[in-house]
Amino acid sequence: MTEQKVVIIDTGCANVSSVKFAIERLGYDVTISKDPQVVLSADKLFLPGVGTASEAMKNLEERDLINLVKQVEKPLLGICLGMQLLGKFSQEKGQKADELVECLGLCDGEVKLLQTGDLPLPHMGWNTVSAKAGNPLFKDIEEGEYFYFVHSFAMPVGDYTIAECDYGNPFTAAVQSGNYYGVQFHPERSSKAGAKLIQNFLEL
């Protein structure tokens, strides 16, 4: 079970320690790397991210990670901003407020500011997630289980959506596009349900 090569991609824009500990608690060894050989020989990959999409894509470019991530053929899980980076574009502009940020384009989604009505931004704290029946990422996780969110931008619900959440309006809580998976919430901060989701991903 634990002989897999598990790699957290070293994006330079995330505190990876909590993700690393969450994986290690399940009995897996984890490597943090941006080395192409290590990344492409991994059995499972994690793409965490914090900050803005523009900063994160700049970091990926500086580290020669954009094409590398696109070459991955094994399951990859983007977490929070890491999920958003899988989309085509993001409205989260960072320094330049007049243009969309081009993302990795691995999933046919565009990241937009949450339309929350009267609810405050960021969307921060525990909220329920409703997953599509039968997706292995949510195996044995109860419908309406709570996960922990911290974000102001999200993908709208679309064909790529495998789970959704509602905060004023529905948004995508998890995506899948081929071998690329993403979760908007933080599974490493989401108690037993989050640990189960990480375990499900590692067992894909």
From Swiss-Prot:
InterPro entries, sorted: Class_I_gatase-like, GATASE, Imidazole-glycPsynth_HisH
Keyword Amino-acid biosynthesis set for record: yes
An example Gene Ontology molecular-function term: glutaminase activity
Enzyme Commission number, as recorded: 4.3.2.10, 3.5.1.2
Keywords: Amino-acid biosynthesis, Cytoplasm, Glutamine amidotransferase, Histidine biosynthesis, Hydrolase, Lyase
Start and end residues of each Glutamine amidotransferase type-1 domain: 5-204
Record has Amino-acid biosynthesis as a keyword: yes
SUPFAM superfamilies per UniProt: Class I glutamine amidotransferase-like
Annotated compartments: Cytoplasm
Cellular compartments per GO CC: cytoplasm
Domain of life of the native organism: Bacteria
UniProt record, GO biological process: L-histidine biosynthetic process
HAMAP family registered for this protein in UniProt: HisH
General function of this protein: IGPS catalyzes the conversion of PRFAR and glutamine to IGP, AICAR and glutamate. The HisH subunit catalyzes the hydrolysis of glutamine to glutamate and ammonia as part of the synthesis of IGP and AICAR. The resulting ammonia molecule is channeled to the active site of HisF.
Protein name according to UniProt: Imidazole glycerol phosphate synthase subunit HisH
Source lineage: Bacteria, Pseudomonadati, Pseudomonadota, Gammaproteobacteria, Vibrionales
